Amino acid sequence: MVVIDRAPFPRDKVCAGWITPAVAAALELDADDYRRGRTFQPITGFRTGRIGNGEKDVETRYPRPVSFGIRRCEFDHYLLCRSGAEVRPGTALTGLRREGERWIVNDEIEAPIVVGAGGHFCPVARHLGGGGGGEPIVAAQEFEVPLDAAQDCPVRPEVPELYFARDLKGYGWCFRKQGVVNVGYGRFGSERLSAHVAGFLEFLRARGRLPASVTGRLKGHAYLIYGTAPRPLVGDGVLLVGDAAGLAYAQSGEGIRPAVESGLLAAGVLLGARGRYRYEDLAPYRRQIEARFGRRDAKPGLARLIPSRVLEALGASVLGSSWLTRRIVLDRWFLHAHQPALSPALHPSA
C-alpha cells in the first residue's frame, strides 16, 4: 500500500480534535501507548450555550470520559505509522488515468485500486465527478496555540465549551487540552464567515472565556454534510472515504468517526473483493455506508427549511434545558452514544 499526500507529515489539520470511545474501540487504539508523548485529554463534560449577551450556559457532566481530546498532527501521524504503509509525503496527485484494469498514478505508480481520502478537495473525488463546485458546504476557521503557564485560561481541559449561533446554522468551540487551546467556528455556507468568527471571538473574550493574550492565525476548512450533495462513492477500481466522500455528521459536522468507520468498511469490502475491483465488486461499500449513516437522498436538512425566527425559539428551548441538552445535543448529535462502535474485525463482504 502506498499513501501519497502533498503535505509533509506530521501535518496540521483544521479540527476541534476529539474522539469518542467508539472511535478508539473501532481502531483498537492502545490508549496507554498513544498517550506517551501525545495529547490524550479525557472529556467528562461540556459547557454549552448560545452566542449573545445575557445567555445562560448549561454544564453537563458525565461519570466517565465520553471523549478524548487529541491533536490531529499527532493522531493522523500515529495511525499512518501504525498502518505500515509506504508513505510519500510532499507528493501531490498530478496524474490519474485508467489503463485496462489498473490505475497509473503520477506516471510512476501502478495500482489495481485507488482510495480517495484527501478531504473535501480530494482530486480522486473530482475524478469520480464530485467536488466540482456549487456543493452546499460547511466552512470553518480555527486556531490552535500553546498555552503559556502564565496565561490564565478559565476553560477546563475536561469540559470543552460549545456555543451555538442563534439561528442554529453554526457553532463555535473553545477546547483546552493539556498544553494547547483550540478555538474555532463552523457554519453552513461561507457567506460572512469571517464576520461570524470575529463575533464569536469577541463573545468569548467579553465573557472572560478566552484571554486577550491567547490568539493565533486562523486556518480555514470546508466539508460536506452527509446527504446534502451525495458524491459517487465507488467506480471501477476506485472508492472514496471520509470527507472526500462527504460523510460528516449533519448536526455536529464531525468527520473523524465517519472517516474511521468508512475506512474500515472500505477495507472490509476490498478484502472481500479478492482482487476483483470492478464497480459491481465494490458496490457493497455504498450499501454499507447507507446502512451505517442513512440514505443519501440529497434532501435539504430540516434546519434549512424552518424559518429563522422559529429556529431561534427552538434553539433557546433546547439549549436552555439541561435534559434536552444532554439527551439531544450532546448524547445524540455530538457523541452519537446511541450508535454502537463499529467492530474492528474486517470480515470479507458477501
What are these regions (language model features)?
Residues 18-78:
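A conserved beta-strand/loop capping segment in the N-terminal third of enzymes
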Residues 63-67, 130, 254-256:
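Short glycine-enriched, charge-decorated loop/helix-capping segments at active-site entrances
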Residues 95, 191-270, 275:
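FAD/FMN-dependent oxidoreductases across multiple families
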Residues 81-212, 228-232, 246-247:
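Predominantly flavin-linked oxidoreductase catalytic cores and closely associated redox partners
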Residues 1-2, 108, 112, 239:
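Hydrophobic "anchor" residues on beta-strands that sit immediately upstream
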Residues 1-15:
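Glycine-rich FAD pyrophosphate-binding loop
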Residues 13-16, 129, 186-188, 251-254:
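Short, solvent-exposed loop/turn segments at secondary-structure boundaries
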Residues 268-350:
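C-terminal helical "tail/cap" subdomain of flavin- and related membrane-associated enzymes
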